Amino acid sequence: MIPLQHGLILAAILFVLGLTGLVIRRNLLFMLIGLEIMINASALAFVVAGSYWGQTDGQVMYILAISLAAAEASIGLALLLQLHRRRQNLNIDSVSEMRG
């Protein structure tokens, strides 16, 4: 069994990597990937904590987080596909330009 500290440290590292990818990258697809990494890191923290205390709540929260991530990914990818068809670019700077 993995100790609680090791699992939570791994989840924190994954969360920081996802947050870094979300903040630094200017491509919307990579920002979506960073958000997915952050969701998976929080799900990992739930599973590790639930395993440590012998509760099944962590696994239930993992299923909830995975279903949330799947819904977010499908909607996000559909929006990115439409944006790419309209602008031929997924750069956040070109998307934020206002028409006027």
Curated annotation (Swiss-Prot):
Broad enzyme group: translocase
Keywords for this protein: Cell inner membrane, Cell membrane, Membrane, NAD, Quinone, Translocase, Transmembrane, Transmembrane helix, Transport, Ubiquinone
Pfam families according to UniProt: Oxidored_q2
All ranges on the Periplasmic side of the membrane: 1-3, 49-59
GO MF term set: NADH dehydrogenase (ubiquinone) activity; NADH:ubiquinone reductase (non-electrogenic) activity; quinone binding
Resulting phenotype, residue 36 to Q: Retains 2% dNADH oxidase and dNADH-DB reductase activity, neither a membrane potential nor a proton gradient can be formed by isolated membranes
Cytoplasmic topological domain residue ranges: 25-27, 81-100
InterPro entries named in the record: NADH_UbQ_OxRdtase_chain4L/K, NUOK/Mnh_C1-like
Signal peptide start and end residues: none
Key word Cell inner membrane present: yes
UniProt-listed GO biological process terms: ATP synthesis coupled electron transport; respiratory electron transport chain
NCBIfam families documented for this protein: PRK05715.1-1, PRK05715.1-2
Record family assignment: Belongs to the complex I subunit 4L family.
Protein name per Swiss-Prot or TrEMBL: NADH-quinone oxidoreductase subunit K
Provenance organism: Escherichia coli (strain K12)
Lineage: Bacteria, Pseudomonadati, Pseudomonadota, Gammaproteobacteria, Enterobacterales
